Amino acid sequence: MYNGILPVYKERGLTSHDVVFKLRKILKTKKIGHTGTLDPEVAGVLPVCIGNATRVSDYVMDMGKAYEATVSIGRSTTTEDQTGDTLETKGVHSADFNKDDIDRLLESFKGIIEQIPPMYSSVKVNGKKLYEYARNNETVERPKRKVNIKDIGRISELDFKENECHFKIRVICGKGTYIRTLATDIGVKLGFPAHMSKLTRIESGGFVLKDSLTLEQIKELHEQDSLQNKLFPLEYGLKGLPSIKIKDSHIKKRILNGQKFNKNEFDNKIKDQIVFIDDDSEKVLAIYMVHPTKESEIKPKKVFN
């Protein structure tokens, strides 16, 4: 039985569910879950939690992501990416804008911004996914969402050809960000229709492309009984949270029993959640959170016995 976090390189053409389904067959275990959907035409890092690490999948998902995308100015699509039907075209020429204009524009997207999720997305409205409305040719009001663009920049020259302009960007962002919507919004600010024509996720949950294994590599390592060496411990998935190392055996026992604590029993100022780590084994004991009605207390959220 495997336990840990496995960064998978998802190839284009596969859904995130396809990856999990194939891994369950390869590893012969059902206790597997991915940490955030990647669209079929998107390649890149997809951290997968296996065994006891499935308990920290939400935390891996919250750790932020990085992407490299190609923005195509001059044509918009129904899906906001290269897979959709054309909605609008407008010829683009090198006299319309230059790379300095693009760089200044990208700066304006840094920070907390509002996005309207695309119709072809899994965001739910009134209990129904948006893509279900889209497939039935139904329109529905999509709620604006705040997302965090931590960094964004151009990483290629502008390529003007066939009445369109293409350039690559790198984006570091929080969860829930739609890069294809970002591409169309860049076009709106330039005064042109636009879409995202290619996307690769280069980092997710602290894992980068060089950490990631293809399904074929995973199959080979499993057959060689050496896959466990490539898995990251569940502790890695919690590195985004503050932590305290516990030495006292009596306190360790209380934590593992799921007892409440007064915050002032610990030196650290606990604001929201805290991870307790065994000082001897370096293993996670539990995740605690501030009590919702008694701010001076902390209570267990997850205990790892």
Swiss-Prot record:
Active site: D39
Catalyzed reactions: uridine(55) in tRNA = pseudouridine(55) in tRNA
tRNA processing recorded as keyword: yes
Sample GO molecular function, one term: tRNA pseudouridine(55) synthase activity
EC class: isomerase
Keyword annotations of the record: Isomerase, tRNA processing
One family name in Pfam for this protein: TruB_N
Family of this protein: Belongs to the pseudouridine synthase TruB family. Type 1 subfamily.
Function: Responsible for synthesis of pseudouridine from uracil-55 in the psi GC loop of transfer RNAs.
NCBIfam families: TruB
Protein known as: tRNA pseudouridine synthase B
Name of the coding gene: truB
